[in-house]
Curated annotation (Swiss-Prot):
Lineage top rank: taxon: Eukaryota
Protein name stated in the entry: tRNA (guanine(10)-N(2))-methyltransferase TRMT11
Enzyme class: transferase
Species name: Bos taurus
UniProt entry keywords in alphabetical sequence: Acetylation, Cytoplasm, Methyltransferase, RNA-binding, S-adenosyl-L-methionine, Transferase, tRNA processing, tRNA-binding
Keyword Cytoplasm applies: yes
EC number annotated for this UniProt entry: 2.1.1.214
Main location: cytoplasm
Biological role stated in the UniProt entry: Catalytic subunit of the TRMT11-TRM112 methyltransferase complex, that specifically mediates the S-adenosyl-L-methionine-dependent N(2)-methylation of guanosine nucleotide at position 10 (m2G10) in tRNAs. This is one of the major tRNA (guanine-N(2))-methyltransferases.
GO molecular function: methyltransferase activity; tRNA (guanine(10)-N2)-methyltransferase activity; tRNA binding
Subunit structure: Part of the heterodimeric TRMT11-TRM112 methyltransferase complex; this complex forms an active tRNA methyltransferase, where TRMT112 acts as an activator of the catalytic subunit TRMT11.
Gene: TRMT11
SUPFAM superfamilies: S-adenosyl-L-methionine-dependent methyltransferases
Catalysed conversion reaction: guanosine(10) in tRNA + S-adenosyl-L-methionine = N(2)-methylguanosine(10) in tRNA + S-adenosyl-L-homocysteine + H(+)
Amino acid sequence: MAPPGILNRYLLLMAQEHLEFRLPEIKSLLSLFGGQFISSQETYGKSPFWILSIPSEDIARNLMKRTVCAKSIFELWGHGKCPEELYSSLKNYPVEKMVPFLHSDSTYKIKIHTFNKTLTQEEKVKRIDALEFLPFEGKVNLKKPQHVFSILEDYGLDPNHIPENPHNIYFGRWIADGQRELIESYSVKKRHFIGNTSMDAGLSFIMANHGKVKKNDIVFDPFVGTGGLLIASAHFGAYVYGTDIDYNTVHGLGKASRKNQKWRGPDENIRANLRQYGLEKYYLDVLVSDASKPSWRKGTYFDAIITDPPYGIRESTRRTGSQKEIPKGIEKCPESHVPVSLSYHLSDMFFDLLNFSAETLVLGGRLVYWLPVYTPEYTEEMVPWHPCLKLISNCEQKLSSHTSRRLITMEKVKEFENRDQYSHLLSDHFLLYQGHNSFREKYFSGVTKRIAKEEKSSQE
């Protein structure tokens, strides 16, 4: 990679959705394509404009072929806090870098993008005319130009107090757009097989990107449900595999989750979902299995484990077993036998997940999962820890005023040893981890209090 001093600067135009997830996604994708996150900005916060240094245009294009958090990327030619600063910055940009895109045989157009303000057509034309000092020699073509240039103006984040002049102005050459259209084309509303907790398409792709899923990877989901997370990974060329304890869900049986449909159809299953999107060739298998009792031989199989464990709200947390005493001489169960299940404590579920990931992920492989938390009691120490896994990112999605879930991304940094299996018991935060077990009670406690408060308000 080229040294930082000669890296080209690029401007990322970010989507104003899932704000906490944006930075980890961009960092993960740059790492995947051999780049490194280098920026002169101190903070990103909610701003849609990010200035990055990227080794090559190819890496910038590869980044945009994957990201669902960014709208577009531009080669940054100049920027400033006022028009005069922008023009001065543009005049200092090396002419030899401009010439290949401005010569007489080329066609171009200039677009205006404003954030938090709408300009009149007259104002737009005035801004474009002010750039006449740039050495444009080509012809204007508004329909199919070879090169597109953009003026981007940032008027801040407060729609109730829009300033007269922008906080920042940018000018650059458009390189590529992101993959925001995937959110609509893979929408759960259009999907053949769905469940009560099918993951939003946008979040599914974000999880795959956080997991650095790439072509020919093997991706596993131990709580597969209706397989929404597998679809996103398969779209990026990974082979997908899953397990779930629910026999009916795995086999597409029982009551339907879709409105005005009582029972699931004969072809409602995960494989049919992949077939719907032309991704069936990436389907390995989905099995009925208990995540608390992995049936795998020792070894590393998976490049990524991406999952959304049940929280006990819409889907129950279960594992196989019985509270009854089991006779020693019990006969062997037939193949069609469906075992009795017990409740599965959240803290146990997450430690089993981390241990399983540490054992079966390849070195450098990633675990991406959702951790539900009761917001008033949450601290970073409550995030489960494992000696083989390094925490990469921790992003919050609010569910209600008192609950949220956090997208946890971890990377395997050392090989698993038997002594690592019970390392969480030695952690100073073990009692904090066990606090996850009461998430369901706290969730419904908050709901009950809210309903009571609303009823009281309506009576007054």
